[in-house]
């Protein structure tokens, strides 16, 4: 069990922008995604109608709770017009630096960038986490609706995931949220507007459609 005095999950990591303060040469999530993109982008098509799904073997210490087939089945529930131009969905491997800093404030489930969705594997050490300061109510609601166990104990708020709840989190929330950023990519307004749309998108096409 991991105790996090000020631990913040980036439940739906930000859509990457050129001026994103965390988009630096030291961000291990960005570095892994950039390498994966560079390995495959020369095979992308300008007129993509459905995304490629590219899965890397998961590193020790991580769990990728979804398979390429499950991702494909989930995206089939999204109206086709929202998938046009989406080049790829990457299921990444994780890195040692990510694992070392898993309890820090840069933890990321995934993000949208360059017409691609990148999903990061989940550190096994975070399957059970203690928050001495309770997560935001909206995050607790998201954890609860995927079936995570949430309890209040003497040390703080405890969130426990099993494989089933983590799979639901990735498929119905994180993945569809990031596809929502793709659907809303022409909107260059305030980031809060982008996040509100992506959150609505995940509710509409992740939870309501997938049940």
Predicted regions and their residues:
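A metal-dependent hydrolase signature that marks the N-terminal structural subdomain at the beginning
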Residues: 1-145, 149-164
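Small-side-chain structural scaffolding
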Residues: 108-110, 180, 198, 202
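Hydrophobic, Leu/Ile/Phe/Ala-enriched alpha-helical segments that form helix-helix packing faces
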Residues: 74-82, 179, 205-209
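Post-HExxH zinc-binding segment in Zn-dependent metallohydrolases
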Residues: 191-211
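Active-site recognition of the HExxH zinc-binding catalytic motif
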Residues: 173-186, 198
């Amino acid at each position: 069990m991991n105790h996090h005095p000020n631990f913040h999950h980036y439940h739906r990591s930000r859509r990457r922008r050129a001026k994103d303060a965390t988009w630096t040469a030291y961000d291990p999530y960005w570095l892994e995604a950039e390498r994966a993109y560079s390995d495959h982008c020369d095979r992308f098509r300008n007129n993509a109608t459905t995304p490629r799904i590219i899965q890397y073997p998961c590193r020790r210490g991580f769990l990728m709770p979804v398979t390429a087939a499950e991702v494909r089945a989930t995206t089939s529930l999204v109206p086709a017009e929202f998938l046009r131009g989406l080049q790829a969905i990457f299921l990444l491997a994780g890195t040692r630096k990510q694992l070392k800093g898993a309890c820090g404030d840069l933890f990321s489930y995934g993000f949208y960038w360059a017409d691609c969705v990148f999903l990061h594997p989940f550190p096994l050490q975070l399957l059970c986490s203690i928050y001495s300061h309770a997560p935001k109510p909206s995050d607790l609601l998201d954890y609860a609706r995927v079936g995570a166990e949430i309890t209040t104990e003497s040390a703080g708020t405890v969130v426990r995931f099993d494989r089933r709840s983590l799979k639901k989190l990735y498929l119905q929330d994180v993945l569809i949220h990031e596809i929502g950023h793709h659907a809303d990519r022409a909107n260059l307004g305030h980031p809060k507007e982008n996040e509100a749309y992506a959150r609505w998108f995940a509710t509409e096409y992740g939870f309501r459609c997938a049940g």
